[in-house]
Amino acid sequence: MPKMKTDKGVQKRFKKTANGFKRKQAHLRHILTKKSTKRKRHLRAKCLVAKSDVPAIARQLPYA
């Protein structure tokens, strides 16, 4: 049986942890001048993928 392929885009964006998959938050790439310092600071923190999305991520990362 052939090896399962890892989705490389998903591999770069998500990291497997004991509690699920860790991801970076959106809205921190551009148009930052109108966002407050507090909002930008909070967006820097990593967060976990939603429970409903975990099976899809796990399927794309078979060796994670």
Curated annotation (Swiss-Prot):
It comes from the Bacteria. InterPro entries: Ribosomal_bL35 (IPR001706), Ribosomal_bL35-like (IPR021137), Ribosomal_bL35_CS (IPR018265), Ribosomal_bL35_sf (IPR037229). GO terms for molecular function: structural constituent of ribosome. One of its GO terms (biological process) is translation. PROSITE patterns: RIBOSOMAL_L35 (PS00936). Keywords: Ribonucleoprotein, Ribosomal protein. HAMAP family: Ribosomal_bL35. Belongs to the bacterial ribosomal protein bL35 family. This is Large ribosomal subunit protein bL35.
